[in-house]
Structure formats: structure tokens, C-alpha cells
Amino acid sequence: MKTLYSLRRFYPVETLFNGTLALAGRDQETTGFAWWAGNARLINLSGKLLGAHVAHAGLIVFWAGAMNLFEVAHFVPEKPMYEQGLILLPHLATLGWGVGPGGEVLDTFPYFVSGVLHLISSAVLGFGGIYHALLGPETLEESFPFFGYVWKDRNKMTTILGIHLILLGIGAFLLVFKALYFGGVYDTWAPGGGDVRKITNLTLSPSIVFGYLLKSPFGGEGWIVSVDDLEDIIGGHVWLGSICILGGIWHILTKPFAWARRALVWSGEAYLSYSLGALSIFGFVACCFVWFNNTAYPSEFYGPTGPEASQAQAFTFLVRDQRLGANVGSAQGPTGLGKYLMRSPTGEVIFGGETMRFWDLRAPWLEPLRGPNGLDLSRLKKDIQPWQERRSAEYMTHAPLGSLNSVGGVATEINAVNYVSPRSWLATSHFVLGFFLFVGHLWHAGRARAAAAGFEKGIDRDFEPVLSMTPLN
């Protein structure tokens, strides 16, 4: 292979060991891309690329609809969702569909409707994808200039960015409208153990909403993941939706400033790397949210958080031993600290034992037993309700651990129910996907910057030093 760039397109080139390999009538010399970079053939074919994106959306929506119906078909109303390995129905239940007090599923028909709507949508998207990939115009610039683009056209790219931002803003407002006007959403903090309610008193104070962003990510602070009431969550979506829509309008109406034109790389691969970087951040944040937050991800549907299961076990044994006559306020544990209750470093009364590390847990079954200085001893003696006992015993035995030994004091038993928490699945999958997206971001950012700088990492195999060296044998 004689050139390190394509004579026809001036794109960065993959350097193959075998530069003469031709597949489907394409070879590296004429296209500038190796056989495995299949998407590269669509770089300048906006119509075909549209088809690929629409078809991909169809696959995503088809999976959502099919998996939704699969979960509905296998759903057992008598068991909690998190015991059935469900990952889609918990999201629908959190939005207030089909559930009542305590998160009990009253009606699965809304879930069926959701699955069917997604399947129908996927058929429309699939048809559109096949049409644009096979039958429609290869390029859109001539026939449909509004939908056409050139990757280097900075103004067009920011217009497309603006359209995307407006669509994201509309999505944020869909949640707001559902919570305000269309039946409400599930609130795990509703009195008596959770219920569906309309959110009437939105938090719109910027100091509260943006205060979450300024909090430390550690300990009892917990950054945005620490949000624990729906007024703040829905109010945050009002702010987010407004910012996205206003930012979208701004990007449609303006051209990039000089500093942005200089600082950013303006190529298709650069935009891919920016998108992968953003998705990576989303994945890591979602991982933390589903692992720690029991308001946006109610434990009634997703199972308890790790700290919640640990605190639930301490509470369950406190209830048991108190009934057997133990004085839970003064009993000493094996380390000399309180066996059931102790004080945190700042003086609050907290659960003793290994679960002390999770003393800043907030959960709707536990908060009614707190006073101004942490857990209230008189409430623990007189005010514990049966629903709190039932829920804590249930959460104690459904920790999202996947471990054979004790973690955070939670007794795990290898002969127990065959159980993997949806929290474990969702947190792990989003972390792993976030990581791979980050690697993809670095890869494509490096290639895009190299191409913009006028070079491409790689060795011309015709003159590779190893070719002139003595064979190993």
C-alpha cells in the first residue's frame, strides 16, 4: 500500500497487514478504509446513513416492545417485580402505570399497551430504515437540502445539535406532564408505604435544583444521586427541559463562535467521539443512580439498595430481640459498641454492628422512626408498624449483593432463593457500557484529532523494519 491517505477522499486510513484484500468490490487502496470499517462507506452518503440510523432505532424499539411483552407474559402478580428478573416493568410502574398503594400491581393492561405500541413503532421505523437504506436517495443534499449536510459545515452541525437538544427537552417535559397532569407518578415516600400521586408543588428554586450539582459526591452528600423527593426530581426536569429547548433554539439561530471553531474538530468521526463521551457520562451517572437512589428507582420495584438491605437486617433483628426482652438501647455488642444502636461520629443515634457504615441511608420504611437526633428510642419501642417489619424483613433477604459471604453485615446464604437484583443488573450493565463507550470516545477522538492534524498513526507495511530482520528460527 503506497499512500497513508485515500487519494479520493483524504480521510485517515487503516493500515492493514494485507493491503490488497478486496471485499464486495471494495479495497483499501481506493476507499481509504479497511474491510472491517464497514460504516465508513456511509460517510458521504447521507441518505444511506439516515437509513442505518432509522433501522437501528427500529431494532432498539423492537427490543423494548418484545421484551416488554415477554415480561408481561411471565409476570406473577403475587411476587415483587424485583424477584422476577424484570427490568422494563419497574420503569413503567415507577411512572405510575398499573400500580396502587405499596407498589402493588393492580392492572397489567397498561404494560401490554406499552409493548404493543413499541412493536408497532418498531415496524414503522424498520420500514423507514429499509426504505432509506435500499430504495431512497443515496444523498439528501440535492433533493432535500434541509435534511442534507456536509460534515465540515459548522453552522449546519450546530443546527442539527439544536434540533437534538429540543427533542431532549421535549422528552424531559413528557415526564413533567405525566407527573403533573396524567395520573401522577409512583412516590415511594407517600405515607403508609408508597402510592401513585400527582406532583403539585414543584421545586423550581434554582438554589435547590442546582445545589445538587455543587454537593460532594461522597458520604452523606451524594451529589445529584442524593435527591430524595419527587418535587425536586420533577422540578429538575422542568429546568432541564427548559435549558435544552432554549439551548436548542440558540444553536439553531447562531453560528459557532471563533473560539469554538478553533477549539473543536469538525468531522464526522469527531462528532462520533463527542457523542460517545456524553453517553459514557450518562452511563456512569445512571449506574450510581440506580445503585444508590431509592426515590427515582423505588425499592418496591427494583429491590432494596445495598445499604438499605443492610439497615433492614439490623432493624429486623432489633425488632425480634426487643420482643424477646432485650434492652436495645443499652445492649453491648462484641466490640464494646452498641449491639443494636450506637452514635455516629456527629452524635446521631444509628444502627449498630457492621451496618454502621450505612448510617446515612434514607428509606421510607425507616424515616418515621427518626427524631431530631437520629433514631428515636421511644419510637423504636412503641411506634414500629407491621408494614415496616414486613418490608424490612423482605429487603433484608433481597440484598443486591451476588456474594457468598457477608457484605455490610448482611447474612447471605448460598442455599437461599436464586435471586439477582435488577439493581445489580442495571448498575453493572450501565457501568460496563459506560466504560466501553469511554474507550470508544478515546479511540475515535484520537483518530479524529490525528486526521485533523494531517497524519494517521500506523506503519507503511511495505517498509516495516521487521521485514528486513533475520527469521527467528
Curated annotation (Swiss-Prot):
The chain crosses the membrane at residues 69-93, 134-155, 178-200, 255-275, 291-312, 447-471. It is a multi-pass membrane protein. InterPro entries: PS_antenna-like (IPR000932), PS_II_antenna-like_sf (IPR036001), PSII_PsbC (IPR005869), PSII_PsbC_sf (IPR044900). It holds the Pfam family PSII. GO terms for biological process: photosynthetic electron transport in photosystem II. One of the components of the core complex of photosystem II (PSII). It binds chlorophyll and helps catalyze the primary light-induced photochemical processes of PSII. PSII is a light-driven water:plastoquinone oxidoreductase, using light energy to abstract electrons from H(2)O, generating O(2) and a proton gradient subsequently used for ATP formation. NCBIfam families: psbC. This is Photosystem II CP43 reaction center protein. It comes from Morus indica.
